[in-house]
Amino acid sequence: MEPAFWQQRWADNQIGFHQAQVNPYLQTYWPQLQLAPGSRVLVPLCGKSLDLAWLAGQGHRVLGVELSRRAVEDFFREHGLEAEVRQQGAFEVWRSGDVQLWCGDFFALRAEDVADCVGLYDRAAVIALPVQMRARYMQLLSGLLPTSCRGLVVTLDYDQSLLAGPPFSVRDEELRQGFAGWQVEQLEAVEVIEESPKFVQAGASSLLERVYRLSR
């Protein structure tokens, strides 16, 4: 999946993956990670998610990584924030208060960029990537993030043969294999097929949202 795919989705405002409210799983389960105030949290493929502002509101320093400059601009504009913009390596870094959004290719991140990220939040990143890319994504996270990191990951699980994706189905065993060096605990699995007409029309009988806590 090429970067141009996501750039075009944002250009055409085809952003059905964007949620108009803070994710309820984040609000319910994030406190269980027990991160100290001021902890830095990595949010990969963050878009213009409202979750970024929520995390900052919990006293965290937020590092979001997003390919689309349109998404980054929209986040700051929609929150009425003026951002300082500078170049850092392969990324254009936008900052306002405790929120930094790094505009660029996630796979260009280096260990020193996230060395102090002791929190990870993935609501729509791993499910946005096809199988080979998400294996690379999980491997990269495991290699970059410090051993003290704890995280929350939300996935979708459905019959992938019925829809091409994105969003892609990520089976429980695939996530555990991808984060093999982590302790992976499933916190909740919720059947949401009745709220998902696209999947019903494709013939899916089940669509599970799974919530995981990661630590190591």
Swiss-Prot record:
The entry's keywords: Cytoplasm, Methyltransferase, S-adenosyl-L-methionine, Transferase
EC number: 2.1.1.67
Catalytic activity, reaction form: S-adenosyl-L-methionine + a thiopurine = S-adenosyl-L-homocysteine + a thiopurine S-methylether
Binding site for S-adenosyl-L-methionine: 10, 45, 66, 123
GO CC annotations, alphabetized: cytoplasm
Enzyme class: transferase
GO biological process, one term: methylation
Pfam family, one: TPMT
Primary localisation category: cytoplasm
PROSITE patterns to which the protein is assigned, alphabetical: SAM_MT_TPMT
Gene Ontology molecular function: thiopurine S-methyltransferase activity
Record localization: Cytoplasm
Superkingdom field: Bacteria
Family: Belongs to the class I-like SAM-binding methyltransferase superfamily. TPMT family.
Protein known as: Thiopurine S-methyltransferase
